[in-house]
């Protein structure tokens, strides 16, 4: 076959291969449609009803559920809790994760084992993790009070304390997911060329100066990824709270996710639960978008 014939043959076949690729998008598009778009639309419609979640009979109530949401004092208390979990977990996961990454990026003998130990809690179910810590903090027979008893200290009911249990939840969430932040930061650190540090040392820059002038600016993409992921995960925290306190005492440790669960299954108030769900979705969307925009701008400024 001549060169011209081969060229013509290739040109005829190539468009057919390209045109067939759109079929590959169908499974992903169907998954998004069935598991994301349809539930969101259905949930939005439920917010305009007084459906109890089980009966086939319900009434359209217009915007009554939204009026109820904004006038309900529980909404704002639980929003404050949710922001506490989301922003608190994000702060501690990133600070501790970065410290772990800086330490384990050094040439130390046990760094492989230490990385595994730090990352191991990520592989445990959040619900199981919550029950593990429940048995540690439990008032009756908990490991913490047994330890305090050895030193003659009176037992404390930490999980029933409205001032303590939100911080315990943040601590557990940080402990479980700090390994993800560490891995992302390690990847970012290992992508920084060593030539930059060698040049800085030759110029007499100390380690602190190298961190703020080289490491931190070049880690900004990793920081952006971690911040956004941690905020989204923290704002929809559910399993650990259910295992530890079930949102109690009262609504002291409720998050928006656990409050929705409580409304739907315990109070049989599906219309209001769906309204809280839509509200939570917009809170997460707005905060994560603002965080992404802010840190993307910081990336540009520090590059």
UniProtKB/Swiss-Prot annotation:
The keyword Transmembrane applies. Gene3D superfamilies: MetI-like. It is a multi-pass membrane protein. Its main location: membrane. It is found in: Cell membrane. One of its GO terms (cellular component) is plasma membrane. PROSITE patterns: ABC_TM1. Signal peptide: none annotated. One of its GO terms (biological process) is transmembrane transport. The keyword Repressor does not apply. It holds the Pfam family BPD_transp_1. InterPro entries: ABC_transporter_permease, MetI-like, MetI-like_sf. Disruption phenotype: Deletion of the gene abolishes induction in the presence of melibiose and raffinose. The complex is composed of two ATP-binding proteins (MsmX), two transmembrane proteins (MelC and MelD) and a solute-binding protein (MelE). Part of the ABC transporter complex MelEDC-MsmX involved in melibiose, raffinose and stachyose import. Probably responsible for the translocation of the substrate across the membrane. This is Melibiose/raffinose/stachyose import permease protein MelD. The gene is melD.
């Amino acid at each position: 076959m001549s060169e011209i014939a081969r060229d013509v043959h290739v040109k005829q076949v190539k468009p057919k291969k390209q045109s067939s690729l759109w079929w590959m998008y169908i499974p992903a598009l169907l998954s998004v449609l069935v598991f994301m778009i349809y539930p969101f639309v259905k949930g939005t419609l439920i917010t305009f009803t007084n459906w109890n979640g089980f009966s086939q009979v319900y009434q359209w109530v217009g915007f009554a559920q939204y009026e109820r949401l904004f006038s309900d004092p529980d909404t704002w208390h639980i929003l404050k809790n949710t922001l506490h979990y989301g922003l608190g977990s994000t702060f501690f996961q990133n600070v501790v994760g970065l410290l772990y990454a800086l330490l384990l990026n050094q040439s130390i003998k046990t760094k492989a084992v230490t990385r595994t130990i730090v990352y191991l809690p990520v592989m445990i179910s959040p619900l199981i993790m919550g029950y593990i810590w429940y048995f540690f903090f439990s008032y009756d027979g908990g490991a913490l009070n047994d330890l305090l008893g050895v030193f003659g200290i009176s037992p404390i009911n930490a999980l029933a304390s409205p001032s303590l249990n939100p911080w315990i939840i943040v601590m557990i969430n940080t402990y479980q997911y700090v390994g993800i932040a560490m891995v992302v930061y390690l990847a970012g650190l290992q992508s920084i060329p060593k030539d930059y540090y060698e040049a800085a040392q030759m110029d007499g820059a100390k380690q602190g100066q190298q961190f703020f002038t080289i490491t931190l600016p070049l880690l900004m993409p990793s920081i952006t990824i971690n911040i956004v992921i941690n905020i989204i995960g923290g704002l929809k925290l559910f399993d650990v709270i259910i295992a530890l306190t079930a949102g109690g005492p009262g609504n002291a440790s409720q998050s928006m996710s656990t409050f929705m669960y409580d409304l739907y299954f315990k109070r049989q108030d599906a219309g209001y639960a769906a309204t809280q769900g839509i509200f939570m979705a917009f809170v997460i969307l707005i905060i994560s978008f603002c965080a992404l925009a802010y840190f993307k701008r910081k990336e540009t400024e520090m590059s």
